[in-house]
Amino acid sequence: MAKEKFDRSKSHVNIGTIGHVDHGKTTLTAAIATVLSKHGGGEAQSYDSIDNAPEEKERGITINTSHIEYETETRHYAHVDCPGHADYVKNMITGAAQMDGAILVVSAADGPMPQTREHILLSRNVGVPYIVVFLNKMDMVDDEELLELVEMEVRDLLSEYDFPGDDVPVIAGSALKALEGDESYEEKILELMAAVDEYIPTPERDTDKPFMMPVEDVFSITGRGTVATGRVERGEVRVGDEVEIVGIKDETSKTTVTGVEMFRKLLDYAEAGDNIGALLRGVAREDIERGQVLAKPATITPHTKFKAEVYVLSKEEGGRHTPFFTNYRPQFYFRTTDVTGVVELPEGTEMVMPGDNVAMDVELIHPIAIEDGTRFSIREGGRTVGSGVVTEIVK
């Protein structure tokens, strides 16, 4: 069977369902797909087909995730749903499923619960920029005032974690009733998706961001100069562009790209996703090394101290068998290189067990080009023992 062509005329947005266990995330996911399929946007999905999420490996971590797609009139959505709480934690920290926005599902009958709070905090830390709220199971709540009370609680909770709680769209409905075909509740699903369409902006594409390429390898070509190779992570670079070499060394240096090659062919420019060799003017072979990045000037800076949200692999995932404490000194793997760093745990956290997630402070022995949202692995002797994301630059 010929593959269907991906329709690029609609803008593409990645979203997911978050919230406390049993509040109806998976049922809502099935309901959205099913209701939209009646309006010509994708395939209907059953609860079971989504709940039996396949196992995936991301940076050596086992994550169960369901990916489904559906369409509204203006957009194509890729939607991720996870069966277990631990899967959400891993997913959000590793960035296995990058979310441009999330639908927070809260049971109107129960109100916000511990994982509701934890998912909001995680969203804030790992950079999920927008949240829309679905108050589920409203058919189980007879009291209009109770519904209003739960809505207020959710708005306050969002504001507590720096989301605009007063402005966030909140839609009440019943995912189960909608999935069963009750028209008044199907209407609520369409209302929810209209809010998602309007409130969650279309993300900036990687190619529109400022240029950055992690350096994987360096070699010199006699008579031509030094070439740095790597995969362009974001933006685009043109022959003649000025770039900075950032990281490892304390000082950032500038150079000009005098040539761009891909598959031994010369190009005028390269963009996000391309594997290239960049010929650099006036750069000696020893002036640049793996682990640095080439970047558009003044867009990323080298740092040694940062705060991070980290998931520590369990023993079953090939992680550590024992806990670690403050002053733990593993390797932090950023993009293409390992750098030793020292961990400081938050006050009141004695130790971190395999399988935990934790906020920590890190100080690296060399500066690395990092910014909020930069992802990294924690390794010991080449074995991955953790995965993290930078939540704040300290120095």
Swiss-Prot record:
Residues 174-176 are annotated as: G5. It catalyses: GTP + H2O = GDP + phosphate + H(+). Pfam families: GTP_EFTU, GTP_EFTU_D2, GTP_EFTU_D3. It is found in: Cytoplasm. Gene3D superfamilies: P-loop containing nucleotide triphosphate hydrolases, Translation factors. Coiled coil: none annotated. GO terms for molecular function: GTP binding; GTPase activity; translation elongation factor activity. Monomer. Belongs to the TRAFAC class translation factor GTPase superfamily. Classic translation factor GTPase family. EF-Tu/EF-1A subfamily. This is Elongation factor Tu. It comes from Enterococcus faecalis (strain ATCC 700802 / V583).
